[in-house]
From Swiss-Prot:
This is Putative B-type lectin protein L288. It is found in: Membrane. It comes from Acanthamoeba polyphaga mimivirus. Disulfide bonds join 69-87, 118-138, 171-187. Keywords: Disulfide bond, Glycoprotein, Lectin, Membrane, Transmembrane, Transmembrane helix. CDD domains: beta-trefoil_Ricin-like. GO terms for molecular function: carbohydrate binding. It is a single-pass membrane protein. Its main location: membrane.
């Protein structure tokens, strides 16, 4: 074999090897399996005070704190008490635990659907007063003690504080516990469990 022939064969072999390596590189990157990342589910749309208020005004629902429900103890009337009680299954008659927000941000009970009496603060509604919650004849101004504004809590986008419109530093508070009247208390931190409320619409 001449030297020239040997060089030609060597060059051909090198070119074939380079072509093979190029093909393998292409195949590896073209057809390698890329694992599909697990789905985290649809994104949660952050609630806003406006969206919460709209939901409360759109229909009846329960107002809950740590699995217990705001409850009218009897047919609403002047000074009728409102307590935090164990939630009743919606398949049963839980009208005493169903609420709706009026156009001026007051809460009425399904036991009084015409809205004669509203959820009210018994007392001056001053910060730190620990005034109890009860029913009183509805007023027309949303700046009264009967007006409430939801405030989003950063630690849980589904829960919120209910701030009293007369004194915007006081919130609806369930700290007295089960079968007791909630109170108006100074709004605490976002992690204050007794002030974490959620409105759950009742399907008609």
């Amino acid at each position: 074999m001449s030297k020239t022939t040997f060089i030609i064969i060597a060059v051909i072999i090198i070119l074939l090897l380079l072509a093979l390596l190029g093909f393998l590189f292409y195949w590896r990157h073209r057809y390698r399996h890329t694992p599909t990342p697990p789905s985290s589910g649809p994104p949660v749309t952050p609630a806003t005070p406006a969206s919460i208020t709209k939901a409360m005004q759109s229909g009846w629902g329960t107002i809950e704190n740590q699995g217990n429900c705001l409850t009218a103890t009897s047919n609403p009337g002047a000074n009728t008490s409102i307590e935090l009680q164990t939630c009743i299954n919606p398949s049963s008659d839980n009208s005493s635990q169903q609420w709706k927000m009026t156009g001026n941000n007051s809460f009425i009970s399904k036991l009084d659907p015409n809205g004669t009496y509203c959820l009210d603060v018994d007392g001056t509604a001053s910060v730190g007063s620990s005034d109890q919650i009860h029913f009183w004849q509805c007023q027309q101004q949303d700046t009264t003690k009967m007006g409430w504004t939801p405030k989003i809590t950063t630690n849980n986008p589904l829960n919120y504080q209910l701030v009293n419109n007369k004194t915007t530093s006081a919130c609806l508070d369930a700290s007295p516990g089960i079968n007791k009247q909630p109170i108006l208390q100074t709004c605490g931190a976002n992690t204050t469990a007794s002030q974490q409320w959620v409105f759950k619409p009742i399907s008609s």
